[in-house]
Regions:
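A charged N-terminal "starter" segment
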Residues: 1-179, 223-229, 430-450
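Active-site loop/helix belt of alpha/beta enzymes
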Residues: 2-7, 11-30, 187-327, 390, ...
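Charged (often Lys/Glu-rich) extended helix/loop segments that serve as interaction or gating elements
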Residues: 3, 301-450
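General structural feature for long, well-ordered alpha-helical segments within catalytic domains
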Residues: 54, 58, 70-73, 77, ...
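Structural signal for hydrophobic packing residues in well-ordered secondary-structure cores
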Residues: 62, 78, 82-85, 109, ...
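Active-site beta-loop-alpha junctions enriched in small/polar residues
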Residues: 73, 94-98, 115-119, 138-140, ...
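Structural preference for beta-strand elements that scaffold enzyme active sites
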Residues: 88-90, 109-111, 130-134, 155, ...
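Short acidic, glycine/serine/threonine-rich loops at helix termini
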Residues: 102, 125, 145-150, 167-170, ...
Length: 450
């Protein structure tokens, strides 16, 4: 087997970078098995199989770019999370959402965290009950709130005093009173990028703890007949590897959680995952054990739940591309251009995120050649993998892959340069099913009414 279970041992130290490319000593080695989906293996010819499906055959059948998700991997991560938090888990759908994904996590017993009316409608279109949804967002519109309230949404996570005003106005107009959580910003620094740190003092999310806004929001919600205050919510950031960061936040929140003695306490998500050679992260189980221990130490007696997203979906998928050009610039670098790019994975452009790359036709091959994998967009920064490693015989026409693209790739995709967004397939037991089709030119023009 090429694949392994998700995660490795917890990292000892952390850097401010979320990801980094592998060191020169590691670059020539085969792609690390722990970065591949759970069921990944090589067939007799050395070609990558996922879910029993030959990925080169998938590229021929569905075209490239193509997201390939290992359904067994997704379900295994869901089950690990549910066991670690005693069945109290909401999947953070911003990581990756389509109707098939919503159905899958619902089948595994999870509720679903949605942050916009669009995410809400996709989950409902998958026949997920409104009571199994948690409505997030720092700027929910009146229309979004009203739809969720009239449907009977499970929880609304309140993010501002303006939102409290909206809830009270909607209930006064006849909407049913919702059950709410108050999102508190603990104001701590975490080891991640500024763009994904959500619990720092300077953040658009939540009620600040330090200035008394959090206490004021709790008091107002508790006194309001327009809502039922169920608990407190916190989220410190994304791609966080350090268990100490979570423990620090829980220690800061212990007094206010204890003072209010509410039944629910949600720790959010944010657990980091490895993207490149040499990175390590806690497993979901290890993370949960640390959360429970920190809650005990902070005197938090409420029922604890979590909202993982990246740790469920990221390593479950790879993206397949086809090589279109290879441009060697003597003394500078070799550019390998593919038929996708920043429109299907904007994370390298947004965050400087590192990724690996490999050839599925030779998944266990050494990778002695250094290249920079770039997309087809009109941006010099459209780089998917900088100084990546590939086999020496890479050629135009090859199918090339990047692993760990199951979270914040498809969900953050765009039509930049009017590129069509790629399809998504789920694979299991030797069968591939199309769950998101490739966009067409008709789709591209459908909203262009000028």
């Amino acid at each position: 087997m090429v694949g392994t279970t998700s995660g490795s041992t917890p990292a000892g130290g952390q850097t401010d970078r979320v990801q980094s490319n592998p060191s020169p000593t590691d670059r020539s080695r085969p792609v690390p098995p722990q970065l591949l989906p759970r069921t990944a293996e090589a067939d007799g010819d050395g070609t990558l199989l996922i879910g029993g499906c030959n990925v080169l055959d998938l590229a021929e059948e569905f075209g490239t770019p193509l997201f390939v998700y290992d359904e067994a991997h997704l379900r295994e991560r869901c089950r690990e999370a549910m066991a670690a938090f005693d069945g109290r888990v909401a999947y953070a759908s911003k990581a990756f959402l389509c109707r098939a994904m919503a159905r899958l996590v619902h089948e595994e017993g999870m509720t679903i965290d949605v942050a916009t009316g669009g995410e809400y409608r996709v989950a409902r279109a998958a026949e997920v009950p409104a009571a199994s949804l948690v409505m997030h967002g720092n700027n929910k519109s009146g229309a979004e709130l009203e739809l969720a309230m009239r449907d009977g949404v499970g929880r609304i996570v309140v993010d501002s005093f303006d939102e409290l005003d909206r809830l009270e106005a909607l209930v006064a107009d006849g909407a049913p009173a919702p059950a709410v959580l108050i999102r508190i910003n603990p104001g701590i620094e975490v080891h991640t990028l500024d763009e994904v740190a959500t619990g720092v003092p300077d953040s658009k999310f939540g009620f600040p703890l330090a200035d008394g806004d959090a206490a004021g929001a709790l008091a107002r919600a508790a006194a309001s007949p327009a809502m039922e205050l169920m608990g407190i919510h916190v989220h410190i950031g994304s791609q966080v590897f350090s268990a100490e960061n979570f423990a620090d936040a829980l220690a800061m929140l212990g007094p206010i959680v204890g003072e209010w003695d509410l039944p629910e306490f949600v720790v959010g998500g944010g657990l980091g995952v490895p993207y490149v050679t040499g990175e390590e992260a806690p497993t979901i189980t290890q993370w949960a054990n640390g959360i429970h221990r920190a809650c005990d130490e902070a005197g938090i007696r409420a029922t604890v739940s979590a909202e993982p997203g990246r740790s469920i979906a990221a390593a479950a998928a790879i993206t397949l591309y086809r090589v279109g050009t290879i441009k060697e610039i003597a003394g500078v670098r070799t550019y390998v251009a593919v038929d996708g790019g920043m429109s299907d994975n904007p994370r390298p452009v947004l965050y400087g995120s590192g990724y690996e790359t490999f050839l599925p036709r030779a998944v266990a091959a050494e990778r002695p050649r250094t290249v920079t994998l770039v997309g087809k967009h009109c941006e010099s920064g459209d780089k998917l993998v900088v100084d990546g490693a590939v086999p020496a015989d890479l050629a135009v026409g090859d199918v090339i892959a990047t692993p760990v693209t199951g979270a914040y790739g498809h969900s953050m995709g765009s039509n930049y340069n009017k590129v069509l967004r790629p399809p998504v397939v789920f694979v299991a037991d030797g069968q591939a099913r199309l769950v998101v089709r490739r966009e067409t030119m008709d789709d591209l023009l459908a909203t262009d009414v000028g």
